[in-house]
């Protein structure tokens, strides 16, 4: 049994597009394998901001295409129609047989059973699957005709440890991918998903979005227990930040306590909606001046923390100004 593993590397895809695209891509390949009667044991999809991945495990290396009887044109059809049928099936007229059915007498061709290698089938049909992938929002770039969420840079495609060979628009598949989105001259060969996953894990990148989400939740729990405060559960925001980052790092930030005079609801919407931050609350449900940021990197110098604190201070200054202005106006 074999493994099929595909990675589409692009510029950063917005979080709102990732979930639909990874599910749609997986379902399209599942449908292809079902139509072609290719069995598999397990299938899943993953995404990071730059990588869209599908994985099939326990795939058959080859399939047996069953014998079938293919109906052709009527025996009295024009010769051109008969020749077209012969060409499309790559047969001679001597291979045809006549059969009477309800609608008249027709030519038929008995197509014998044959074995087909799964790798050949993938090389033929994978580009068609990719072409049918629809995006809620897409773009074109350069002189290319491809519509994609963001510029597509490379396609890694491996079956049974071997690189698939097919073209998709301006790209040709290989068994390599970019290992650092910032430095696209750094590439590495991968022959299976296990080595791929381990490599990126060692680089601090969590390929599996479900594991990224679990990691963030566990870090929240650790911080909550240590600081003795409550982090409001917001699954929509949690899912969004999970798809924004690939190397999640939780930062505890603060804003000036003077902004606590602003109504809690305004503070929450300013942090959650505008900045994707997670506000914190004490045991009595009162909002605190500490908030959590899910960063996409280590903050060894403290610059990410400082930058986010400056941003939220500016946001809250605006919110305070408009709140005070509204209070001063009589209804």
Indicate residue ranges for each PLM-predicted region.
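Catalytic nucleotidyl-transfer cores of nucleotide-processing enzymes
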Residues: 231-331
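Long, basic N-terminal domains or extensions that often function
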Residues: 2-273, 281
């Amino acid at each position: 049994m074999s493994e099929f593993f595909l990675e589409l590397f692009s510029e950063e895809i917005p979080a709102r597009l990732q979930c639909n695209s990874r599910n749609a891509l997986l379902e399209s390949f599942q449908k292809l394998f079902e139509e072609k009667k290719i069995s598999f044991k397990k299938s899943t999809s993953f995404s990071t901001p730059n990588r869209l991945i599908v994985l099939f495990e326990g795939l058959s290396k080859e399939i047996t295409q069953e014998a079938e009887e293919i109906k052709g044109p009527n025996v009295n059809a024009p010769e051109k129609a008969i020749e077209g049928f012969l060409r499309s099936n790559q047969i001679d007229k001597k291979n045809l047989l006549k059969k009477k059915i309800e609608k008249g007498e027709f030519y038929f061709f008995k197509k014998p059973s044959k074995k087909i290698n799964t790798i050949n089938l993938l090389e033929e049909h994978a580009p068609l699957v990719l072409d049918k992938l629809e995006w809620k929002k897409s773009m074109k770039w350069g002189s290319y005709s491809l519509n994609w969420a963001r510029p597509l840079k490379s396609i890694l495609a491996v079956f049974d440890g071997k690189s698939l060979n097919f073209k998709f628009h301006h790209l040709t598949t290989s068994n390599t991918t970019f290992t650092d989105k910032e430095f696209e001259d750094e590439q590495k060969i991968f022959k299976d998903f296990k080595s791929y996953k381990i490599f990126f894990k060692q680089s601090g990148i969590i390929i599996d979005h479900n594991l990224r989400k679990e990691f963030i939740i566990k870090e929240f729990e650790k911080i909550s227990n240590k600081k003795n405060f409550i982090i409001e559960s917001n699954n929509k925001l949690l899912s969004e930040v999970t798809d924004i980052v690939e190397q999640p790092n939780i930062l505890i930030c603060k804003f000036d306590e003077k902004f606590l005079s602003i109504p809690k609801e305004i503070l929450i919407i300013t942090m959650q909606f505008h900045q994707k931050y997670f506000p914190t609350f004490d045991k009595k449900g009162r909002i605190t001046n500490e908030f959590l940021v899910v960063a996409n990197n280590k903050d060894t110098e403290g610059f990410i923390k400082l930058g986010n604190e400056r941003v939220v201070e500016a946001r809250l200054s605006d919110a305070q100004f408009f709140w005070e202005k509204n209070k001063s106006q009589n209804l």
